[in-house]
UniProtKB/Swiss-Prot annotation:
This is Probable transcriptional regulatory protein LI0269. One of its GO terms (cellular component) is cytosol. It is found in: Cytoplasm. The keyword Repeat does not apply. The lineage of its organism: Bacteria, Pseudomonadati, Thermodesulfobacteriota, Desulfovibrionia, Desulfovibrionales. The keyword Transcription regulation applies. One of its GO terms (biological process) is regulation of DNA-templated transcription. InterPro entries: Integrase-like_N, TACO1_YebC-like_2nd/3rd_dom, TACO1_YebC_N, Transcrip_reg_TACO1-like, Transcrip_reg_TACO1-like_dom3, YebC-like.
Length: 246
């Protein structure tokens, strides 16, 4: 597994998606606020364009999108949000990256340190694990909607890197610089994407046993449940036979 959808699949199987809908709206709005700091016109701001597309994919209302843009550009208050990437280790020595959007850096780092230590993890210095990951564009498609051949052809034509079988879904990766070009090519081809985002992809995975897997999942869930966290990435590789028992 490529490592991106594996964690999403665990969440789906554990029935966490519906419970997270409210937080997904908050995360999407924060990403728009941060992106809009570099300009409120999506045509000239690729990150904002991607953030709006992601927000629309989860049905964030148009007025919420527009309000977030105004906050990011400084037209309205509420845009004082800082983006930070924290690093650390989880049970079994797995690497953990925590993407945070916060209006209070001191509060966030103190809370994250508590969550990590409470769940068998520890915070690391800047650069301690980030070198194990690469930021890439990630496009996810329903397995039942497209064949491997169809998506491989579309990926090559769009200039994407590779295609991964992630169980219930197909996952296409591309370089960060090509993300918007590839997304626009897929949209032009009328391909329906389950999601399209920039994500930190682990270069190598660490396999764990079932007891460690339970601890890692508990930590990752606790981190994702924290309000200031936008995304959590890990290089944990949980075999399917163990994942089925979680």
């Amino acid at each position: 597994m490529a490592g991106h959808s594996k964690w999403a699949n665990i969440q789906h199987r554990k029935g966490r998606q519906d419970a997270k809908r409210g937080k997904e709206f908050t995360k999407a709005a924060k990403e728009i606020i941060i992106a809009a700091k570099n300009g409120g016109d999506p045509s000239g701001n690729p990150r904002l364009r991607a953030a709006i597309a992601a927000a629309k994919s989860i049905n964030l209302p148009k007025d919420k999108i527009e309000a977030a843009i105004r906050k990011g550009t400084g037209q309205d208050s509420g845009g004082d949000i800082t983006e930070i990437m924290y690093e650390g280790y989880g049970p079994g020595g797995v690497a953990v990256l925590i993407e945070v959007a916060t209006d209070n850096r001191n509060r966030s780092v103190a809370d994250l340190r508590h969550i990590m230590s409470k769940n068998g993890g520890s915070m690391g210095e800047s650069g301690s694990v980030s070198w194990m990951f690469e930021r890439k564009g990630v496009f996810v498609f329903e397995k039942t909607a497209y064949s491997e051949e169809e998506l491989m052809e579309a990926a090559l034509a769009a200039g994407a890197d590779d295609l991964h079988d992630e169980g219930d879904t197909w996952e296409i990766h591309t370089s960060m610089s090509d993300f918007n070009t590839v997304r626009e090519a897929f949209e032009s081809d009328k391909l329906i994407m389950q999601s399209a985002e920039l994500a930190m992809i682990p270069q190598n995975m660490i396999s764990v046993d079932i007891e460690t897997a339970k601890k890692v999942v508990k930590l990752l869930e606790a981190l994702e449940d924290y309000d200031d966290v936008q995304q959590v990435y890990s290089n944990v590789d949980i075999p399917d036979e163990i994942m089925n028992e979680l």
